[in-house]
A protein has these predicted regions:
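PLD/PLD-like phosphodiesterase catalytic module centered on the HKD motif
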Residues: 1-26, 30, 34-41, 46-65, ...
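Proline-centered turn/helix-capping motifs that create local helix->coil transitions or kinks
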Residues: 64-72
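Long, charged amphipathic helices and adjacent flexible linkers at domain junctions
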Residues: 71-80
Length: 258
């Protein structure tokens, strides 16, 4: 089978998807590694829809023919009916900023619940609205992050004045009901990769899941997200988030040094 490497500098080819026979898509947050299957939290979706499969095939063709992350993700996120559900396939970097704004608006419109799993939260639209929601204290908001990865972000922001303005927002968000998995910090020489790796947002009955962290870098990487309007699935995945966060202690912001 032909294969092609996509340069990951400066932005990552971060997709994890398969299209089978132009009819079915397998996608989500899980890399194809032993640790991903056995040591990490991940979410995977299977969508049986030729129109959705066509969107992913178009995105694959962008990567295959250009070999350049920055020239991809330009497939429009037009809605598709899959049974009685409305589904959108989002791709970045072409629609990266639009995706962050879309998720932020869904959170802002939520009236019953918001559940989040994301290793980090750094995308400005999402960070801003979450800080507002936590401050208002009226919405059932909870989630889980990867504590060492968020601590790494905090350390970087403290060293870089250009993004230090985000620190009060992140600190405010993490005073909410967020757990932090104490994973093994990433090391260049390898080791255990047991990160909290799921990328999932539930806002009332709307679900966003895929390869995209809620991050500024994610807006620029080659990523994909499924947006699904499905009350039953939203209930299932909100319960999944609650299960994940119940396994770990609350996030601790004040233990960051540097």
């Amino acid at each position: 089978m032909p294969a092609r490497a996509i340069a990951g500098v400066p932005d990552l080819m971060h997709h994890k998807y398969v299209v089978r026979d132009g009819e079915t898509v397998w996608t989500g947050s899980m890399n194809w590694t032993d640790d991903s299957f056995t040591r990490q939290e991940n979410v995977v979706a299977i969508v049986r829809s030729a129109p959705i499969a066509a969107r992913f095939e178009e995105n694959f063709a962008e990567l295959w023919h250009t070999g350049a992350v920055e020239l991809t993700g330009r497939v429009p996120p037009n809605p598709v009916r899959v049974g009685d559900r409305k589904v959108r396939a989002w791709f970045t970097p072409g629609y990266g900023e639009a995706l962050s704004t879309r998720i932020a608006k869904a959170i802002a419109r939520a009236r019953r619940r918001v559940r989040i799993c994301s290793p980090v939260i750094t995308a400005a639209p999402v960070l801003s609205i979450l800080a507002q929601v936590v401050s208002e204290g009226e919405l059932d908001l909870a989630g889980c992050v990867d504590q060492p990865q968020v601590h790494g972000v905090i350390h970087q922001w403290r060293q870089n004045g250009n993004v230090a303005w985000k620190l009060p927002l992140l600190e405010r968000v993490m005073t909410g009901d967020f757990a932090g998995k104490r994973s093994e910090p990433w090391r260049p020489g390898g080791g255990l990769h047991n990160f909290m790796h799921a990328k999932l947002t539930v806002a009332d009955d709307l679900v966003f899941l895929g390869s995209y962290n809620l991050s500024r870098s994610g807006e620029r990487n080659a990523e994909n997200v499924l947006e699904l309007d499905d009350p039953q699935l939203a209930d299932q995945l909100a319960a999944y988030v609650d299960g994940v966060r119940s396994r770990y202690p609350r996030f601790e912001f004040d233990k960051v040094t540097g």
